[in-house]
């Protein structure tokens, strides 16, 4: 039976707790999108397996786009705080303008109150569709389709979103 010794030359420098790299607090990863005639902020939640909107937002969107009904869906959602909710239904193939490209997106419609600043939650299926890359160090979300791409900087994610600001971002 032999023994294995591993010598680490710079062990004191590696193990020192006071050499931690401190980074600034990362902002909320979000993107600004347009649905119908309205601009919205959307939270990029890579932990979410679905995209979701509140019922109030669904009603707002319905007034701007071609009539589409909510389909019944037998799903229960488990939230981060371990609560469970059942959505009202699913709103399919909603055209979401993200950058300069419109992407079809399915949203679960929830009966929960609307967050006026960021009413939309974008989950992993949306990120797959838009080929999203989230970079926490640069605080950016890149979306692309073919040769077209757009970068959102969420360190500048403001609490106010107007049509003019949306057009400037694109």
Write out the residue ranges for each language-model feature.
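Proline- and glycine-rich low-complexity segments
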Residues: 1-170
